[in-house]
Amino acid sequence: MNYRDLTLRERQVLGIIIQSYVVSAMPVGSRTIARNYNLGLSDATIRNVMADLEADGFISQPHTSAGRVPTDKGYRYYVDLIMNVSRIDEEEKRMIDDRFSNRNSELKGTSAEVLGTAARVLGSISRQLAVVLPPRLSNAVFERLDIVQLASSRIMVVIAIQSLFVKTIVMELNAEISRQKIDAVVDVLNERLPGLTLEEIRSTIAQRLSDFKGSEELMNSIVSSADTLFDESSILEQLYVSGTENIVDQPEFKQPEKVRDIITMIEDKFGMARLVDNAVPSALRQVSECEVAISIGTENRTGKAADLTIVSSPYFAGKMIGRVGVMGPKRMNYEHAVRVVNYMAGCLSEALSGNN
């Protein structure tokens, strides 16, 4: 977004309006700024500065108030050019560390629990709605496959992906099959597929297994179902969300229709995943070694999120990349959100690397 260069006074007043509005949820007037902040400016001078900010679209006046509130443009300027992000609070750091570092042996090998824990802790500490997207698995490496026989013609295929995720699918066969034939198929699959990405398996499995002789019916069922068995998109159904009460308790969302919109949005896991994923292009701030994306109001790609800000950061599990973030009102404490999201992303990367 392009802006004109704000003067020092304009930056100071805009920053104060945003910081005050974040705390009080009330429009901010020139008299409040003159009385509570030592800027060395008169009420009249502050009024003039606010008039210039309003004329340029950084703040606006609600219908029933003499004060002003930030616009999306004002928040964006603040995030890009005024906000100063410090290190995470030691107490909050300790709370996160206690749930990850001290429990790493307990969580080892159970990535679903790691991601669920991250969402719960982040929601509690940020006091926003926390969202954790599992890593994209299109470039994930297949590790092994097992088949559990549920009945004479019914099996459950269990696929382990890079020691991090397990996918299960129940299949009905056209005829009964023995355990011996199942084991023969499993042995061949675990000999020829490990080290391939799911995408590579989907596109080449038929030719890789074309010379197999033995349990052809089961192997043919595996090959014909490869697009489903080795499809990564269903992993998004495991989106982890926590802290719904944090967002619906905000003054901005007290009206019943707003609450309904929020709940509907949260229940749409694919829509939520797209929202967080698509937050990346709008603005990136370098914090430590992670890029934190901040998408504000109308920058979000759905009308239901026009009153929300999304702060997110990537985390890493081997070569796979997921995202962790928070959603809340545009009137959020941006510095705090960036700090805790960034730190949580680092903890997730460390925990999942430990599982790998």
Swiss-Prot record:
PANTHER family: HEAT-INDUCIBLE TRANSCRIPTION REPRESSOR HRCA (PTHR34824:SF1). It comes from Chlorobaculum tepidum (strain ATCC 49652 / DSM 12025 / NBRC 103806 / TLS) (Chlorobium tepidum). Negative regulator of class I heat shock genes (grpE-dnaK-dnaJ and groELS operons). Prevents heat-shock induction of these operons. This is Heat-inducible transcription repressor HrcA. Keywords: Repressor, Stress response, Transcription, Transcription regulation. One of its GO terms (biological process) is negative regulation of DNA-templated transcription. Belongs to the HrcA family. It comes from the Bacteria. GO terms for molecular function: DNA binding. Coiled coil: none annotated.
